[in-house]
Amino acid sequence: MQHLVLIGFMGSGKSSLAQELGLALKLEVLDTDMIISERVGLSVREIFEELGEDNFRMFEKNLIDELKTLKTPHVISTGGGIVMHDNLKGLGTTFYLKIDFETLIKRLNQKEREKRPLLNNLTQAKELFEKRQALYEKNASFIIDARGGLNNSLKQVLQFIA
């Protein structure tokens, strides 16, 4: 079995689904944003504000290469922009959690939105969301309809890997 890699826009449910998949499949769960945050000693928002997005993307790219060297399969929850890296291919079986922008914003309360620097301006966030759709689809081994909630997404992933 390869790594199971969850991609999609911020707030699509990647972190929650990763935890459920890890439990169901008895696999360790890794979260790329959390790993970067712990290593740098700053939250993702603080990294963006203090070090800039370019540095954050460099940390992401390096982490992808590092994760490729792991010998055992993991469930990997990724940041929303990870699809901008060419080295994502080959990391594992990739599941795109597809959701519409309106549902995504409804799911995220104000506190959650404040943690996500790219959601500061909803007009710009929607433009980014639309721009990334093609990248998510291009990088996906499978597309998961994430509008139906966590249990529905879990069932879809488990069916694809059965």
Curated annotation (Swiss-Prot):
Belongs to the shikimate kinase family. Mg(2+) binds at residue 15. Monomer. GO terms for molecular function: ATP binding; magnesium ion binding; shikimate kinase activity. The keyword NADP does not apply. It is found in: Cytoplasm. It catalyses: shikimate + ATP = 3-phosphoshikimate + ADP + H(+). ATP binds at residues 11-16, 116. One of its GO terms (biological process) is chorismate biosynthetic process. Its EC number is 2.7.1.71. The keyword Protein biosynthesis does not apply. It holds the Pfam family SKI. InterPro entries: P-loop_NTPase, Shikimate/glucono_kinase, Shikimate_kinase/TSH1, Shikimate_kinase_CS. Pathway: Metabolic intermediate biosynthesis; chorismate biosynthesis; chorismate from D-erythrose 4-phosphate and phosphoenolpyruvate: step 5/7. This is Shikimate kinase.
